[in-house]
Amino acid sequence: MNPLIPAASVIAAGLAVGLASIGPGVGQGTAAGQAVEGIARQPEAEGKIRGTLLLSLAFMEALTIYGLVVALALLFANPFV
């Protein structure tokens, strides 16, 4: 077995987790900031805004979890070996 394949898999796993968390991290920060701004403008809509925010944060976090699954597959169930 070529020793370059496991080394490349470790690097690819790190990149998968790192790059998969950049987009959702920025999106979650923006969404939370806009939710706070919306609640400050209309305090009576707090419940509706908060519920929508939590649902959208869950969908954004799913993208990071997909990256983690890909990284774990590269590390422990390496398809290239």
From Swiss-Prot:
Its main location: plastid. The record marks 61 as: Reversibly protonated during proton transport. Pfam families: ATP-synt_C. Keywords: ATP synthesis, CF(0), Chloroplast, Hydrogen ion transport, Ion transport, Lipid-binding, Membrane, Plastid, Thylakoid, Transmembrane, Transmembrane helix, Transport. One of its GO terms (molecular function) is proton-transporting ATP synthase activity, rotational mechanism. InterPro entries: ATP_synth_csu_bac/chlpt (IPR005953), ATP_synth_F0_csu (IPR000454), ATP_synth_F0_csu_DDCD_BS (IPR020537), ATP_synth_F0_csu_sf (IPR038662), ATPase_proteolipid_c-like_dom (IPR002379), F/V-ATP_Csub_sf (IPR035921). It is a multi-pass membrane protein. PANTHER family: ATP SYNTHASE LIPID-BINDING PROTEIN, MITOCHONDRIAL (PTHR10031), ATPASE PROTEIN 9 (PTHR10031:SF0). Belongs to the ATPase C chain family. In plastids the F-type ATPase is also known as CF(1)CF(0). F-type ATPases have 2 components, F(1) - the catalytic core - and F(0) - the membrane proton channel. F(1) has five subunits: alpha(3), beta(3), gamma(1), delta(1), epsilon(1). F(0) has four main subunits: a(1), b(1), b'(1) and c(10-14). The alpha and beta chains form an alternating ring which encloses part of the gamma chain. F(1) is attached to F(0) by a central stalk formed by the gamma and epsilon chains, while a peripheral stalk is formed by the delta, b and b' chains. F(1)F(0) ATP synthase produces ATP from ADP in the presence of a proton or sodium gradient. F-type ATPases consist of two structural domains, F(1) containing the extramembraneous catalytic core and F(0) containing the membrane proton channel, linked together by a central stalk and a peripheral stalk. During catalysis, ATP synthesis in the catalytic domain of F(1) is coupled via a rotary mechanism of the central stalk subunits to proton translocation. Key component of the F(0) channel; it plays a direct role in translocation across the membrane. A homomeric c-ring of between 10-14 subunits forms the central stalk rotor element with the F(1) delta and epsilon subunits. This is ATP synthase subunit c, chloroplastic. The lineage of its organism: Eukaryota, Viridiplantae, Streptophyta, Embryophyta, Tracheophyta. The gene is atpH.
